[in-house]
Amino acid sequence: MEQEPQNGEPAEIKIIREAYKKAFLFVNKGLNTDELGQKEEAKNYYKQGIGHLLRGISISSKESEHTGPGWESARQMQQKMKETLQNVRTRLEILEKGLATSLQNDLQEVPKLYPEFPPKDMCEKLPEPQSFSSAPQHAEVNGNTSTPSAGAVAAPASLSLPSQSCPAEAPPAYTPQAAEGHYTVSYGTDSGEFSSVGEEFYRNHSQPPPLETLGLDADELILIPNGVQIFFVNPAGEVSAPSYPGYLRIVRFLDNSLDTVLNRPPGFLQVCDWLYPLVPDRSPVLKCTAGAYMFPDTMLQAAGCFVGVVLSSELPEDDRELFEDLLRQMSDLRLQANWNRAEEENEFQIPGRTRPSSDQLKEASGTDVKQLDQGNKDVRHKGKRGKRAKDTSSEEVNLSHIVPCEPVPEEKPKELPEWSEKVAHNILSGASWVSWGLVKGAEITGKAIQKGASKLRERIQPEEKPVEVSPAVTKGLYIAKQATGGAAKVSQFLVDGVCTVANCVGKELAPHVKKHGSKLVPESLKKDKDGKSPLDGAMVVAASSVQGFSTVWQGLECAAKCIVNNVSAETVQTVRYKYGYNAGEATHHAVDSAVNVGVTAYNINNIGIKAMVKKTATQTGHTLLEDYQIVDNSQRENQEGAANVNVRGEKDEQTKEVKEAKKKDK
């Protein structure tokens, strides 16, 4: 009888967690023994794992009272167990049918070119063409006859000699139904072979599975959704036809501590249903001069089998460079330096060094992942793109040029309603005029303050003896000024940091908001009867409003600085004129301290959590509107220049007045 845990966790959650741990323990053992070729032991482990998976899934966790983080974690474990159960059952069915064992045994034999079919009436219905009677003799491959053909064999394990009832020179025979172990998705006609399912069938079957199915710590480094083909090379040297263009991705595991426990590589390459483990400086990869990447076929566990990966020439250059860079980091990538056609065999030659034998190439495909050229130094890519050898034959064909790839549709410029552009330009123009008016008004106000202060000082009678201010008071005010100034700088630094974080978060959130927000917008707003988008027009107006508000806000800041500087300077001058230089200096420190306190209070108000959320939302909106902004910064630059000139002029005047006051006091 199962006991309740001390922390009050329900017994059902404990059962699910125990079933989860035991199930994956047996599944991992089954995977390890399966990779070692111990099929019977692997089946026993798989069956035990399925039992624990069924036990964990059988417990209901969807009742209304099952709430809280514990039940949420349990539901996630059950979902993962369901996905694992499907995969384990599929693998167990394959093992029980003996497909994997038969495939491995058949590969030990030399594959033939054409399938062996019952001789029915095919030879009588298809008379031998005259052109085949004079065909050249066939080349011998390991003692068996084979015909040189452009088409190749996708499943060499099921190949055998042609029927003796047909001449040896006859073309391959076709049957209305697929032979045992094969599937057909096409049918023959008088004009050629046609697919019976269409392009959608292949596209739907070439989509990458979810990343979560590979592991919780799986990290996808690159994903090419389409335009990648693979072909297979058997031990006899025969090459299969390229597969239908599919996806490619490279995945690495973040938790390296589990690699030895689960007996898994640090990462792997996946091209459709084919997987290749990637171990830095150990997994051999050869880039051919013909444009293909060659890998040992480790999934078949048979020596001499290779897989070629071909990238379409229509793929972006950045994807190709990233793919090569990742291979360089995660495998033992090498270049085919020369293609020797004179001897009619493909040799991977390194200029100035001896050539590796074919036995060395075959040994590289074993489980120990030996190096391709034993005894030689590595020939690796240097820089971003490796250069092709100078003596490469000009007759070589780049295989990537024949791989079809879906073209990327060009983005058409959005058609905006006429009213949106007019309103946007009017908003920007009005904001520019308002900002200019604020700066100009502040300049006039500053001059008026200066005139008023001068007239006030003319009516004031200075004290006969300057007021003596205690040095302690002066020093205290000076220290207060320095302290408040430092606080203002620190608070400003913190505000800048908060703004930087908010900007980064806002930029990351903007694409998601735009993606999911567009789903909530009715189609009537996305496009009207004239083909124009009212929503885009409204976004342009909103972006212009943000630009206009920013322009007006900058004008307000410039105007406020001008007025505060003028008021502060004239106040200090008036006190200095009336009570002497020492009193004026003390007043100057006090006014600066008051200004610093105000700035610090304003900055602290913008550091809190609410301010952070507000800034993040604001930056998200700004990022969304970046594509709709209309650049019009000429007037803004003029306003800032005028404000800066005005502030500099005021500071010069203040400096002159301070010097004059010091002379009078002396």
Swiss-Prot record:
Chain residue ranges for the region called Disordered: 124-156, 344-398, 636-666
Region listing for Required for localization to lipid droplets, in residue ranges: 431-503
Function, in words: Lipophagy receptor that plays an important role in lipid droplet (LD) turnover in motor neurons. Localizes to LDs and interacts with components of the autophagy machinery, such as MAP1LC3A/C proteins to deliver LDs to autophagosomes for degradation via lipophagy. Lipid transfer protein required for lipid droplet degradation, including by lipophagy. Can bind and transfer all lipid species found in lipid droplets, from phospholipids to triglycerides and sterol esters but the direction of lipid transfer by spartin and its cargos are unknown.
Gene: SPART
Pfam family, one: Senescence
Compartments (UniProt record): Cytoplasm; Midbody; Lipid droplet
The name this protein goes by in its record: Spartin
Annotated positions of the N-acetylmethionine modification: M1
Gene Ontology annotations for the cellular component aspect, listed alphabetically: cytoplasm; cytosol; intracellular membrane-bounded organelle; lipid droplet; midbody; mitochondrial outer membrane; plasma membrane; synapse
Biological source species: Homo sapiens
